[in-house]
């Protein structure tokens, strides 16, 4: 059987430094990683293609950003997102990792973002690009609030399932600027996140809003537990951001972090009180990898 092919990222994905420090490494077909891969739902299993192949997780000695140095080549990443992550595999993963409650809370989560964008941006109609939009759930909520919203997603299975306007590539966009661009749990999947964000910056109106959200990989340096695997899956989550490194990543590309306005998607006084408490105590609470930025300059 043909083995999957990898390329090496030998400079930092955030600052470009070549000072990379090894955190952990191993073979795909050995240890806990092999067992975790075998448990996951797949269309066509990637495990036979990964026999003897090496993974290597590193950290930048200059800016502390951590990432997998060995990533699939473009050809094999296309296989990853079409054959391995098939529509059936995605549906099974979502079924076993959630259910109706997960969908409900995700809708609430997205609605809060919509209300916050409406508060931050005066322009109407408000134009939003959701990059890596998946099934288009956030876009659907944007449309309900009267936004002009389109998405981009490279997964054929997810594009086919979406009931809204989703393109395979940003090259298909019409060139009109967007007031806001969102990347919900996308940066961790990208071979070249800096290059992608530079490209997206060109589609954002002056003073436009950028929302970034990734898993928080604070303290994760190796793959020993399911939590580790979920954070830095070497086929899917190839970049491991923390609140500090995510902020630094965006700031290097010309974005300034801003506070999120308060929004309440509830009639519960208790939940409103908790939201207000988080707003007031925000600087004292733990940092998060859900961050808002404004394009400067």
Please place each PLM-identified region on the residue numbering.
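Helix-to-beta-strand junctions that scaffold the AdoMet/dcAdoMet cofactor pocket
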Residues: 190-191, 204-206
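Active-site micro-motifs of SAM-dependent methyltransferase domains
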Residues: 65, 188, 219
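Hydrophobic/aromatic residues located in beta-strands of well-ordered beta-sheets
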Residues: 149, 210-212
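Short catalytic micro-motifs in class I SAM-dependent methyltransferases
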Residues: 184-191, 236
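Short, glycine-/aromatic-enriched active-site segment of Class I SAM-dependent methyltransferases
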Residues: 27-41, 212-239, 244-249
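A structural motif corresponding to the C-terminal end of an alpha-helix
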Residues: 249, 253-255
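Conserved N-terminal segment of class I S-adenosyl-L-methionine
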Residues: 1-184, 193-199, 259-265, 271-275, ...
């Amino acid at each position: 059987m043909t083995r999957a092919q990898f390329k090496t990222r030998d400079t930092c994905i955030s600052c470009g430094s070549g000072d990379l420090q090894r955190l952990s490494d191993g073979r795909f077909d050995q240890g806990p990683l092999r067992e975790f891969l075998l448990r996951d739902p797949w269309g066509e299993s990637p495990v036979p293609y990964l026999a003897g192949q090496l993974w290597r997780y590193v950290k930048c000695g200059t800016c502390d950003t951590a990432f997998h140095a060995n990533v699939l080549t473009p050809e094999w990443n296309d296989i990853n997102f079409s054959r391995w992550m098939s529509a059936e595999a995605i549906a099974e993963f979502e079924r076993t990792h959630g259910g109706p409650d997960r969908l409900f809370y995700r809708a609430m989560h997205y609605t809060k973002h919509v209300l916050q964008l409406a508060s931050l941006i005066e322009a109407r109609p408000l134009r939003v690009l959701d990059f890596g939009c998946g099934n288009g759930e956030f876009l659907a909520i944007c449309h309900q609030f009267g936004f002009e919203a389109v998405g981009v997603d490279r997964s054929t299975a997810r594009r086919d399932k979406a009931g809204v306007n989703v393109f395979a590539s940003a090259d298909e966009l019409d060139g009109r600027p967007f007031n806001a661009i969102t990347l919900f749990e996308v940066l961790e999947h990208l071979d070249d996140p800096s290059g992608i964000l530079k490209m997206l910056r060109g589609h954002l109106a002056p003073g436009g809003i950028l929302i970034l959200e990734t898993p928080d990989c604070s303290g994760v340096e190796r793959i020993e537990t399911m939590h580790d695997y979920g954070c830095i899956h070497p086929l899917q989550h190839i970049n491991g951001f923390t609140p500090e490194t995510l902020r630094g990543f965006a700031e290097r590309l010309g974005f300034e972090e801003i506070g999120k306005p308060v929004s309440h998607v509830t009639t519960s006084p208790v939940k409103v009180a908790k939201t207000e408490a988080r707003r007031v105590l925000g600087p004292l609470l733990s940092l998060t990898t859900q961050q808002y930025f404004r394009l400067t300059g």
